[in-house]
Amino acid sequence: MFSSSLLSKDNKSAVDFHEIPLKQTALDVLHAVFGYQSFRKGQEEVIDATLMGKDSLVIMATGNGKSLCYQIPALCFEGLTLVISPLISLMKDQVDQLLANGIEADYLNSSQTFTEQQQVQNKLMSGTLKLLYVSPEKVMTTSFFHLISHCKVSFVAIDEAHCISQWGHDFRPEYTQLGGLKSCFPHAPIMALTATADHATRQDILRHLNLQSPHVYIGSFDRPNIRYTLVEKFKPMEQLCRFVLGQKGKSGIIYCNSRSKVERIAESLRNKGVSAQAYHAGLETSQREQVQRAFQRDNVQVVVATIAFGMGINKSNVRFVVHFDLPRSIESYYQETGRAGRDDLPAEAVLFYEPADYAWLHKILLEKPESPQRQIEALKLQAIGEFAESQTCRRLVLLNYFGEHQQKPCQNCDICLDPPKQYDGLIDAQKVMSTIYRIGQRFGVHYVIAVLRGLSNQKIKDNQHEQLSVYGIGKDKSKEHWQSVIRQLIHLGFIKQVFDHFNATLQLTENAKPILRGEQPLSLAMPRISSLTSVVAPQRYAIAQYDKDLFARLRFLRKQIADKENIPAYIVFNDATLQEMAQYQPTTKAEMLAINGVGATKFERFAQPFMQIIQQHKKVLTQHEPPLSLES
């Protein structure tokens, strides 16, 4: 286990922290312990500031190596590092990964038995721990301070720091107590970290935590390997199933806004042959843990969940995240989509949308008592609505929201890959508006379309609407076409949806009059009916060339090892590391240690069978024989 020395990656000789500068020590830790050849952008800057004893605020996108920003200083400093984390599952996941890298780490939280907590406390007293993960509600208690007073706390890291801000999307009252940490540990640098914080949230974090002249690092919010796609809902369940089946067994998360919908979607996917499980607060704790464990270990392909799922998971090979319903803020959307592609390999973020989703959330919000918090939530809901309705590059809209201004479209979102085609939509708009007006502005989307298309049903007959002049004036176009037209007219402010309990009626706004009179032109986007049947277009994100057959064999071996060790597969090696192995095909110790993600401890613990598989594979290629079985 890692304590106050480490092994050089090249010669494995001991390195004494007192004989070399801390900056060099940090680089040695990166190489020998974590197995990476160089720092990512921003990591070295943040680590250097911490090693100089400065407080810091780190805003860094998920998947960009945020955890290393505090884990490496923790190993460079003498003494203990406290890591404050809001989620029990996240603590365990981080500790498991640190242990796999040979680092003495543990956690204290309410899920542990008295005996387990005593064991952790004994480690603290003996001075063997380098990192201790604790919850925000526990860290400020008298009993914890009595315990920790016997330790040398050299550094404090606060993860998910946006939780301290009421302006943030995930405000947690217990985080507000953390402002006292600076007075409790006056000589320990404090690092606050988050992946999602706009300007107002950042200012709240700095103020509430009492950080002293902090180093502030704001990295790019861009996740170039994630493609953002919006799908208009026409037949949403059919569209969703078709998309998931097109993923061919890849790991994914589907978010919904209700437990009942979660259960329905999970069942529908299972009926289609997809390995899918539901996850929500209505399940027993043991059931939720079982689903989470199965997903982490690649025994379940898809988890359909409410927003509670995923925050505590560091699963690196999630290939897609689907929002079946509109999130309540861009921060939530960004954080949840950020759970895809954490290994830097191509991933999908798909948002299913219709204007009624936004209108319903807005109605629920207005039912809350008037307060500053409601005003904040309203602004955030408006922003995610504008994102969904945008006709410009979705990545630019996201980045602009977080204050990162770029001009060049990304070429990796639905708008860039398939720009909306415009047509003269004045006649279509007049047909829709006239129908809404003639039926008394008392009916919803489906009824308006039924009248437009001249359908014959009992409700239309009862209302005698088949006698109206507008009846059937849109029969030459499909239901999906008129759905798209109505949505665009809502976006443009010519029509509004009015909710009354569970019914939504369409009504004209004042802006509709010039359109009805033909006094102004109107361009509309051609309806994207193709999204009903097509799987999302191929990725344009650059992918390294590697041996696909060898990669599959390495993945299979990894699963066998992970099951035997009773750990998630990505803790052995993540997909990016396996792809690098499949590309460079290392067969010696030096070659394997040059692969990103292979550190000294992981090499000793896991690498040998991977090198054997690679040697077998290379031998087969030279002999032109069929690949050998893994069991051979």
UniProtKB/Swiss-Prot annotation:
Function summary: An ATP-dependent DNA helicase which unwinds DNA in a 3'-5' direction. Plays a role in recombination.
Binding-site residues for ATP, renumbered to this chain: 60-67
Molecular-function GO terms, alphabetical: 3'-5' DNA helicase activity; ATP binding; ATP hydrolysis activity; DNA binding; four-way junction helicase activity; metal ion binding
Record-listed E.C. numbers: 5.6.2.4
Gene3D superfamilies, A to Z: HRDC domain, P-loop containing nucleotide triphosphate hydrolases, Winged helix-like DNA-binding domain superfamily/Winged helix DNA-binding domain
Cofactor stoichiometry and binding remark: Requires Mg(2+) for helicase activity.
NCBIfam families, A to Z: recQ (TIGR01389), recQ_fam (TIGR00614)
Name this protein carries in UniProt: ATP-dependent DNA helicase RecQ
Family listed: Belongs to the helicase family. RecQ subfamily.
One Pfam family it belongs to: RecQ_Zn_bind
Enzyme class: isomerase
GO BP terms, alphabetized: DNA recombination; DNA repair; DNA replication; SOS response
Taxonomic lineage: Bacteria, Pseudomonadati, Pseudomonadota, Gammaproteobacteria, Pasteurellales
InterPro entries: DEAD/DEAH_box_helicase_dom, DNA_helicase_ATP-dep_RecQ, DNA_helicase_ATP-dep_RecQ_bac, Helicase_ATP-bd, Helicase_C-like, HRDC-like_sf, HRDC_dom, HRDC_dom_sf
One cellular-component annotation, GO: cytoplasm
Organism: Pasteurella multocida (strain Pm70)
List of residues binding Zn(2+): 393, 410, 413, 416
Motif (DEAH box): 159-162
Organism superkingdom: Bacteria
Keyword set, alphabetical order: ATP-binding, DNA damage, DNA recombination, DNA repair, DNA-binding, Helicase, Hydrolase, Isomerase, Metal-binding, Nucleotide-binding, Zinc
Listed cofactors: Mg(2+); Zn(2+)
Residues that span the membrane, as ranges: none
Residue span(s) of domain HRDC: 544-624
